[in-house]
Amino acid sequence: MLSSTFVRTKAGRSKPVRLTAVIAAALFLAGCPSQAPQTPPANIQDEASASSDYYLQQLQQSSNDNKADWQLLAIRALLREGKLPQASEQLNQLPKNLSSVQQVESQLLTAELQVANKSYVSARSTLGHIDSGSLSANQLVRFYQAQIAVNQGKASLPLIRAYIAQEPLLTGKAHQNNLDQTWQSLLQLTPQDMNSLVINANENVLQGWLDLLRVYQDNKQDPDLLKAGIKDWQNRYPQNPAAKTLPTQLNQVLHFTQASTSKIALLLPLNGQAKVFADAIQKGFEAAKNGVTPSTPVQQQQPASVPEQAAQPASTDPNANGAVSTSAPDAAPVTAAQPSAPSTAPITPPQAANAQIKVYDTSSQPLAALLTQAQQDGATLVVGPLLKENVDQLASSTTTLNVLALNQPETPKDNPNICYFALSPEDEARDAARHIWEQQKRQPLLLIPRGAFGDRVAKAFNQEWQKLGGQTVLQQGIGSASELRQMVNSGGIRMSGTPISTAPAPQAVTIAGLTIPAPPSDTPATSGGSVDSVYIVATQSQLTLIKPMIDMATNSRSKPAMYASSRSYQAGAGPDFRLEMEGLQFSDIPLLAGANPQLLQQASSQFRNDYSLVRLYAMGMDAWTLSNHFAEMRQLPGFQVSGTTGVLTAAPGCVINRKLPWLQYRQGTVVPVS
C-alpha cells in the first residue's frame, strides 16, 4: 500500500495527499510524444517565401525522399535574392531521377534563371517545352511572368496574350498592374502591327481589348467623345476584365476636366544674354494667340524676297545659359521639297484669343516670388520659365498652378501640375535614336562635339537607344573645322569609338511578384566592330569636312548610313554642298522643313534669317497650343498635337516629345525621307 504524505495548509492544519495520483500523472506525461515544432513539408508548387539559407539547411537535414523538393525551393529563393551563380550551381546538382512534378518545377526554374541572366532566346525555348496544364496556380503566375519578361516590354501578340492569361490569377494591386500593363502594351502597337494581327475565334477577351484600343485611337483627340466611347465599350463587353476595372489611364479619362487658360503668366528672362531668345519665344506665343497656326497662311508683313546673305545679329549660344538648343545663325532658306503630311491632324486650339497674358521677368526676381505673384494676380496657367536653373527650382516649388516649363531638368520629376517642353539638343538626339532604330540600324556611332554639350547629346541618345532595346552605342569627339582639316591629312576619321558610359544599369526582373536584382555586368564593352550608322552633331562647316572623310574611309559595301542634327542645316547652301551631302539624312522642325513656306518667309524676314531665332519663334507658337491643351497632355496618353516644332506627344512625367520630319540630300535637292 502506498504511503501518504501531509501538506500543511495556511490554516495550519495538515491535509493528506495520496501519491498515487501524482505518480500516475507523471507516468502519463512520460509516455507522451515530444511537442517540439514540426517542419512543414516542402511544397514546390506553392509559395517559397523563406530564405535560401533556411531551405538549404532543410536540404542538409532531410531524408533522401525530400531532398529534391528542398533543393528546388532553395533555387527559387536564391533567384529571388539575386544569387544567380548559386542558383545555377544548385540547378546543375539536381538529381536525375526527378518526379514529373519536380521536372516541371525544374524547367520553370531554368526559364526563370535564363530570364534573370537575360538569355531571352533560351528562356523562350524552355518555356515552350512546359505544359501549362500541369502547373499549379502559383506556378502559372510565374510561368506567365516569365513569358512577359522574355518579350522585354516590346509590344507583341504573345506578350498581350500572356498578360490576358495571367489576369484571372491575380488580385488587388497585382491585378490592377496587370490591366495597366496590358493597356500599355496595346498602346505600343503600330498600325502595321494591328493590320497583321491574327487572333483565334475564341479569344473574346483579346478581341475586347483590341476594340477598346480602336475606340481610344479613334477618339483620343476629343475627351468628350472618348468618354462616351469608353462607356459604350463597357456596355458591349461587360465580361471583359477591363470593363469591370478600367486601366488607370482610362479611368482618368472618365474624370477628365479641361484646364482654364483665361489668364496666362508668361515667365521669361527680359534682361541679360537670354533676352534675345525670350523675345523670339514671346513673339511666337503672341502670333499663335492672334490666330497664326502651323497650317494656315499668314499675312505677309515683309518683302517676299530675302537677300541670300543677310547680315546676322550677334547671337549668344543659348546653351550657355541653360536655355534651349539652336543651330548656328543661318542664311536664307533653300527650297526644300514639301515633306509628307504628318499622321496627326493639326489641332485647333480652343477659342482663347481673349486670354489675358502677363509677362513676368525671371531675371529680376526669384522664381518662387514670381509664382506667388502670378497666383495673386489670378493666373490659371504659367508658361515658363525658360532658363534651366529656374526650371530646376520647380521641383521644390509648392505652387498649385499648372505650369508648362520651357525647358526640362536633368531628371524630370512627375508633378501632376507640371509639363516640360524643351527645344533641346537632348530632345533632338532622342528623336534621332528613334528614327535610326526605325530604319533597322543597330550599331550606331555618334560624332559629337567634345565637352559638356556633346556629353549631354550622347547621354540622351544612348538612354533612348537602350529603351528601344539597343545595345552598345559608340561615340567619338570631334573638334573645330581647323582640327578636322588636319585630320584629312592624317588619315581621316576612324569608324570606331568608345562605348558611352551613361547607359542605364541593368534592370531587375520581376517574376511572380518577386524582384530579382540584375546581375553585375562583367562583360567589357568593345570599342570597335561594324558600324552601320553615324549620327553627326556638327555645324555646316564641320559637316563639309566630316562626310567626305567618312566616304573615303569606307567602301560602297560597308558605307554606314549617315544622319545629322539640325545644327548642320543652314540656309543658302549652294548646289556643290548639296551634291557633296548626297544620301545624308537630317532632321529639323516642320517650319524649316517646308510645312508652311509663307510662315517661314515671314519668320525668316522678321529675324533676319537667323534660324536659331526662327526655331524659338516656332517654339513660342507651340507653347501657346500646348497651353490650350495642357489638361489633355497631362491626362490623355497618346494625345498628339501637330506643331511648328514637330508632332508633340507627352511622355511619362509630361515631358513633351517631338517627332521631327527627316529630310535627305538627293541629287542636289532636299527631299523628304520616304
Curated annotation (Swiss-Prot):
The keyword Phosphoprotein does not apply. It comes from Serratia proteamaculans (strain 568). Regulator of peptidoglycan synthesis that is essential for the function of penicillin-binding protein 1A (PBP1a). A lipid is attached at residue 32 (N-palmitoyl cysteine). Residues 292-315, 331-349 have a biased composition (Low complexity). Keywords: Cell outer membrane, Cell shape, Lipoprotein, Membrane, Palmitate, Peptidoglycan synthesis, Signal. One of its GO terms (molecular function) is enzyme regulator activity. Belongs to the LpoA family. Residues 316-328 have a biased composition (Polar residues). A lipid is attached at residue 32 (S-diacylglycerol cysteine). Pfam families: LppC. Its main location: membrane. Transmembrane segments: none annotated. GO terms for cellular component: periplasmic side of cell outer membrane. It is found in: Cell outer membrane. It is a lipid-anchor. SUPFAM superfamilies: Periplasmic binding protein-like I. This is Penicillin-binding protein activator LpoA. Interacts with PBP1a. InterPro entries: LpoA, Peripla_BP_I, TPR-like_helical_dom_sf.
